[in-house]
């Protein structure tokens, strides 16, 4: 899977896209990719990437799949890389931890930035410094 991830990141990067997330379902027969670029993506981007990657994966004989889905990450996109937390500073996010801090594993707050190996998250007016190594899942949580 790391080889596939590296192949996809490299190929998408050459096209000007970022691989936000990848899901494998149906025992790896479905590859679902979430892509983005700074100005956002539309259906034409999804079609372009789908065609490009279908051709690329056809050449890679060791990648066995039946279906490829390309999608935008959505308004509640996942946050995985340090650069995601920097890019979306000032936005509201839901963060789930591996190990509790002050008895809590789930936090909803405003992303305030990154301090070396820590995410700075403001919850109820109090800043929490959360080690990136302790983050299980994080995603934007926009208010409507």
From Swiss-Prot:
One GO biological-process annotation of the entry reads: ribosomal small subunit assembly
Q: Where in the cell is it found?
A: Cytoplasm
Q: Which CDD domains match?
A: YlxS_C (cd01734)
Q: What's the domain of life for this entry?
A: Bacteria
The protein's matches in InterPro entries, at most eight in alphabetical order, are given as: Ribosome_maturation_RimP, RimP_C, RimP_C_sf, RimP_N, RimP_N_sf
A single GO CC term for this protein reads: cytosol
Keywords for this protein: Cytoplasm, Ribosome biogenesis
List, alphabetically, the Pfam families matched. DUF150_C, RimP_N
The protein's matches in SUPFAM superfamilies, at most eight in alphabetical order, are given as: YhbC-like, C-terminal domain (SSF74942), YhbC-like, N-terminal domain (SSF75420)
Q: Which HAMAP family match?
A: RimP (MF_01077)
Functionally, this protein is described as follows: Required for maturation of 30S ribosomal subunits.
UniProt lists the family membership as follows: Belongs to the RimP family.
Q: What is this protein called?
A: Ribosome maturation factor RimP
- Species per Swiss-Prot/TrEMBL record: Methylobacillus flagellatus (strain ATCC 51484 / DSM 6875 / VKM B-1610 / KT)
